[in-house]
Amino acid sequence: MAERRRHKKRIQEVGEPSKEEKAVAKYLRFNCPTKSTNMMGHRVDYFIASKAVDCLLDSKWAKAKKGEEALFTTRESVVDYCNRLLKKQFFHRALKVMKMKYDKDIKKEKDKGKAESGKEEDKKSKKENIKDEKTKKEKEKKKDGEKEESKKEETPGTPKKKETKKKFKLEPHDDQVFLDGNEVYVWIYDPVHFKTFVMGLILVIAVIAATLFPLWPAEMRVGVYYLSVGAGCFVASILLLAVARCILFLIIWLITGGRHHFWFLPNLTADVGFIDSFRPLYTHEYKGPKADLKKDEKSETKKQQKSDSEEKSDSEKKEDEEGKVGPGNHGTEGSGGERHSDTDSDRREDDRSQHSSGNGNDFEMITKEELEQQTDGDCEEDEEEENDGETPKSSHEKS
């Protein structure tokens, strides 16, 4: 009872808020950026003090009117005015408390750390020999991972990695003062927005009009009937699309053994806007082993190399054909004489090598014998030529 009396006395001392204060608080409530979180089991909206000060400095009360001074000229004047709003319980100060892990989880982590430290000491000696192999494998994995990430980024509709945010909770602060900075303040004042008021009024009018459907004219009834049928067909088509895309995914998944994940209209049932639910048209993800990816890449590189080699071979063939047309038969005529000369020179070199294998005296004796044989051979050849010459002469005389 005593606390209630004190609270009533404080309210009487502070007084009720004026129209100007309500207008400023309403403007701040709907224009200052806010966030929602849980506090003491309730869902609340909170804002940051520095953003509230910036918002009020950009408002109409920061500009001087004719014959009147501006309400907000500096940041200090805004802070003083917000202190008045805080005392009149438009909002109150809160304290951010980061969520800590439970003691059981901490003990489990400590026990795991001790067990892992003992195992690591035993494995250190083995790891030193395997470090070189691991470094090579890691480099290859990094390259493959970069390629996969680049491919995923190029494909539209792929979900991006979510950044992990630290969780916190709000608690009421003991010192209820407005300070310009990163302080957190929770809204108590929650007026009805003009848009919500208009939407509620339209909804009430629509319900009353629906109850008066028998009194509508015939043209309006037919029009509403066709509109309702069209809306029902549209909803049914979306449901059929959702079922068909699941069936298509299952068929591709079964045929490829779970390696290819193909989704048609992936955002159709997602919590997005109407237009965003139909974009992108499809998404494709490959979740098979990396060996298949490497094989595909190797096959592509081989195909490229084959195509390059075929192009080179075609160009070389053309050059050879052009070279063959120019020289003609001149090369064939000179080739026969060169072959004969090469065989004679080879024979002479073989004879010289055989003769040089013996001593010096043997070489002299062999040369003399060869000279005698050569002279005898020359004489015999001369006699044969003379005999050949005489035979045609005798034939001519007989004729």
Swiss-Prot record:
GO cellular component terms attached to this protein's record: endoplasmic reticulum; endoplasmic reticulum membrane; membrane; rough endoplasmic reticulum
Coarse class of the protein's main subcellular location: endoplasmic reticulum
Any one GO biological process: cotranslational protein targeting to membrane
An example Gene Ontology molecular-function term: signaling receptor activity
Pfam families from the UniProt entry: Sec62
Subunit note: The ER translocon complex that consists of channel-forming core components SEC61A1, SEC61B and SEC61G and different auxiliary components such as SEC62 and SEC63. Interacts with SEC61B.
Family from the record: Belongs to the SEC62 family.
Protein name as it appears in the record: Translocation protein SEC62
Species assigned in the record: Homo sapiens (Human)
